[in-house]
């Protein structure tokens, strides 16, 4: 059953044309209008229904001015005046969805299969899924820090939140002083967002608008658009197109948070991952499975498994070259730019070995008037619910250090709200070539919560000797019990002491990383923000870290390790008790650190 939207403070004027004379009647008292789908009803203070009708495609009705609506039924017309333009806008969007002819399709409907859209909005209508995203402290904390630190971009401004979900970003905008926030949400989560707005006494500043941003209207243009439209590999789910579509509501010189997105890709070697996929496909190689020969399907099984992008994290030592960056400037990009994304690459190989595929991650930047804040999903940063994505080649390519690996990654948008990926790679010196076709809609979620293993041959001294020579964290005195017999002990006291470094885990999984704090002025170094540019970057810097804690529904807060951010906003301090946007947030791009940027704790 559709949700009921309630609009208080409504006035009613009825106009009749009986016997050739114009007759008018106005309700002197304010009424309450309730709308469910196409059914509207007006009630007085005694809860008596004074008017009721159903709006369909054939109903004669129209907008009048900024906050009124007229319905004609037979010889009588009814004019409904709403208390505010925002109330009228919310009501009008409900009515539009009921009156839209079947032949009229929005931009979203044109690019999306109905079955995919139903599944998509059902998924995001669950509170548990919103919780998963909200508990990603890197994601949520970075958004809050970016908005609060750039409070001048929000104070007394009108903001549009695209795909607001629970409304958390809208609340951040209000915390930064926004005058009005229009929170648009197409899933049933809009009902929960509206309840949160009411329970937080913000109905005068936050207006929840149920519907797709491609199909709704706003009573005014906005100064700022905020959203969290990123999917795996940045582009999955195709919500970035809805984010760009929302620019039709943006004032000239308005801003968008996030402002730019960088996709990074680099070649990797991982024999274990490659063999895992082959091993799974080998199930179909059996000549007598319960008396049935399955081997005819083995080739199809290999193709299917290798079409799956791998979602997990990894040790950065599997990367064999510096990453290439592809930048999208959301302020300049058009929706059609994301229908076909071509990323050329040329890697100067730093190591010899087999290239099994390409690894992908992304960073987004919030470029505000006061500072630029980066949200990174790089393998050196705290793990997020985006993880990293790896795309295998069906046939590995052998390269030597100094070789050039060149080729193209092509992403073609499909109606499943995702992309078909084509990868072609070639070693220029030898002519060795490999390729693969992948389906980003059907990834394999491989992450287990354990520390990623380093590649074989990563130790250049004896790990066993290092284990016993770690700074006196363990002595035979503490390890001996009664009678001089060794007692049971935890090896973490040997290899995980406060002064030691665990060489088996180079990825900080739960612990906030060192804070990157640029000197004043608080802007990152100017960069080329042209859509569709790809550039080489330095290989990601690594900070050693002990392993933190992970849980399936989000990232458990880790210890700050004594590191503290010294540049928290004096206007809107963020409580670091929950590590939300505290030490975890880098104020400079983690993938492109300028020479005058200070790194604490590295």
Curated annotation (Swiss-Prot):
Belongs to the class I-like SAM-binding methyltransferase superfamily. Protein arginine N-methyltransferase family. It is an enzyme of class 2 (transferase). The keyword S-adenosyl-L-methionine applies. It is found in: Nucleus; Cytoplasm; Chromosome. This is Histone-arginine methyltransferase CARM1. S-adenosyl-L-methionine binds at residues 130, 139, 163, 185, 214, 242. Methylates (mono- and asymmetric dimethylation) the guanidino nitrogens of arginyl residues in several proteins involved in DNA packaging, transcription regulation, pre-mRNA splicing, and mRNA stability. Recruited to promoters upon gene activation together with histone acetyltransferases from EP300/P300 and p160 families, methylates histone H3 at 'Arg-17' (H3R17me) and activates transcription via chromatin remodeling. GO terms for molecular function: histone H3R17 methyltransferase activity; histone H3R2 methyltransferase activity; histone H3R26 methyltransferase activity; histone methyltransferase activity; protein-arginine N-methyltransferase activity; protein-arginine omega-N asymmetric methyltransferase activity; transcription cis-regulatory region binding; transcription coactivator activity. Its main location: nucleus.
